[in-house]
Amino acid sequence: MVSPLVINITYLLLMLSIVLSFVRLARGPSLPDRVVALELIATLVVAVIGVHAIDTGIAAFLDIAIVLALTAFIAAIGFARFLERGGPRDD
């Protein structure tokens, strides 16, 4: 079992990363920057779910994390195709 101190520090660092990613999402300056920040937030949420699964010992949370990771990956592919076809970049 993992030490509660390690779990709490991990939660704290992940939450700090999510807050900083939200700042990047709000400030921009361009659309690709915002999408990268959104992808980072999705990845950090997957990490939080993974840590929660370790903390509680419930493996079903890992299924949720996998679905969220796959959804974020598909969204990134869709955005890349949008930019490839000449979508606005707000540069």
Cite the ranges covered by each PLM segment.
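Flexible extramembrane loops and terminal tails that flank transmembrane helices
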Residues: M1-R27, L31, V36, I49-L62, ...
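Alpha-helical membrane-embedding segments
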Residues: I64-F79
